[in-house]
UniProtKB/Swiss-Prot annotation:
Molecular function GO labels: fatty acid elongase activity
Job of this protein: Catalyzes the first and rate-limiting reaction of the four reactions that constitute the long-chain fatty acids elongation cycle. This process allows the addition of 2 carbons to the chain of long- and very long-chain fatty acids (VLCFAs) per cycle. Condensing enzyme that elongates fatty acids with 12, 14 and 16 carbons with higher activity toward C16:0 acyl-CoAs. Catalyzes the synthesis of unsaturated C16 long chain fatty acids and, to a lesser extent, C18:0 and those with low desaturation degree.
Tissue expression remark: Detected in the CNS (central nervous system) of third larval instar (at protein level). Expressed in cyst progenitor cells (at protein level). In the adult fly, expressed in several tissues including, sperm, follicular epithelium, nurse cells and cyst cells.
Name of the gene this protein is made from: Baldspot
Full protein name: Very long chain fatty acid elongase 6
InterPro entries: ELO_CS (IPR030457), ELO_fam (IPR002076)
Taxon lineage: Eukaryota, Metazoa, Ecdysozoa, Arthropoda, Hexapoda
Disruption outcome: RNAi-mediated knockdown in larvae confers resistance to tunicamycin. RNAi-mediated knockdown reduces ER stress response caused by the accumulation of unfolded protein in the ER by reducing Ire1 and PEK/PERK signaling. RNAi-mediated knockdown in imaginal disks results in lethality. RNAi-mediated knockdown in cyst cells results in abnormal sperm cell development with abnormal organization of individualization cones.
Chief site of localization: mitochondrion
Originating organism: Drosophila melanogaster
Amino acid sequence: MINMDISVTPNYSYIFDFENDFIHQRTRKWMLENWTWVFYYCGIYMLVIFGGQHFMQNRPRFQLRGPLIIWNTLLAMFSIMGAARTAPELIHVLRHYGLFHSVCVPSYIEQDRVCGFWTWLFVLSKLPELGDTIFIVLRKQPLIFLHWYHHITVLIYSWFSYTEYTSSARWFIVMNYCVHSVMYSYYALKAARFNPPRFISMIITSLQLAQMIIGCAINVWANGFLKTHGTSSCHISQRNINLSIAMYSSYFVLFARFFYKAYLAPGGHKSRRMAASLAAQNVVKQSSSPQQASESSKFIGAGEDQAAYLRKAKAQ
């Protein structure tokens, strides 16, 4: 028998057994007992990616087009499913209980087993998502600061917030699932050599910027609610708010900087053309023979991949 508080739970048309069997107390206990693991994961991640760059320095790049298609497709499917199972809870709470409940009451974990299960998977998914960087290293694409900084901070913050049952995290989870649904679908198509319209990449970056703005706004509301009602009514810590707003603000600055350079800078080219042109020029300058010069077309493709990656540099 399904044991959920119907008053704060949307009317799911179907609930899977693995969702109904979810017990949030067990997962929280495990996260609390193993909270130090996240720092080991981050340390190993840094060693692998920067060590991998050194390893690949004098080796030819891998194409990995097939694995990349599968990788992006799986992440897109996971994100779509996650959005479909968590967004109804947020909408239901906003409609029937208002903004305060959506920011201050963690019913999405404590009373809703469906949303609680997909919240747990969301946190766990930040570990395999580190694999994005493996493709960058093996394909010898630029590893920009935003990429690895984002991966590490999201993993640590997600783990930390889950142990606290941070109530405002329902917003962050739904937004991340939704944006990743579009983003990974787009990159799966790009990896498969389909060519979605150019404006799609601009829309994705705009969605990422909107995600950061909303994230900052939610934290401002949470801070106000916390000061007005206290921790007894608003289940979020001041430390969490401070960390979250610092994280979202830094993401916004980094994404806004890219957006300006890619789409708005006077006299600038689109990011793909810039990367392809620079790659081609670099090869021509370094080539001293016709055979070497003929390799420029391969580097142009690498430049296009670089630009595609820069647009992907994620949010979380």
